Regions:
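N-terminal glycine-rich phosphate/pyrophosphate-binding loop and immediately adjacent elements
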Residues: 3-100
């Protein structure tokens, strides 16, 4: 990765909070660089496979804490935000095919 001394702000961590911060700062005209150690950004908002064939966001239950102002300001629906209501809070698949 090339280094640059032209950044106004360096944000360590590309989790959802770091990305929101970066978006607001960039909107003011600042040059922002975000560094993330993982191969993808999003932090707790990332959807990952926790069991073969089963994908979930590890912190999807916190979506209710997402400030509506942030959703509007960043036009998240225009960028693919879709909140899906689940009929159950938890799901546990069992090795014998049953679940609860």
């Amino acid at each position: 990765m090339a280094t640059s001394r032209n950044d106004d702000v360096l944000i360590i961590g590309g989790g959802h909070n770091g990305l929101v911060c970066a978006a607001y700062l960039a909107a003011t005209g600042l040059k922002v660089r975000v560094l993330e150690r993982r191969h993808l950004v999003g932090g707790a908002a990332v959807t990952e496979e926790f069991h073969p064939g089963f994908r979930n966001s590890v912190a999807s239950y916190t979506v209710s804490l997402l400030n509506p102002k942030v959703i509007r300001d960043l036009r998240l629906h225009e960028h693919g935000l879709r909140v899906v209501e689940r009929p159950y809070a938890n799901f546990l698949p069992l090795p014998d095919g049953r679940s609860f």
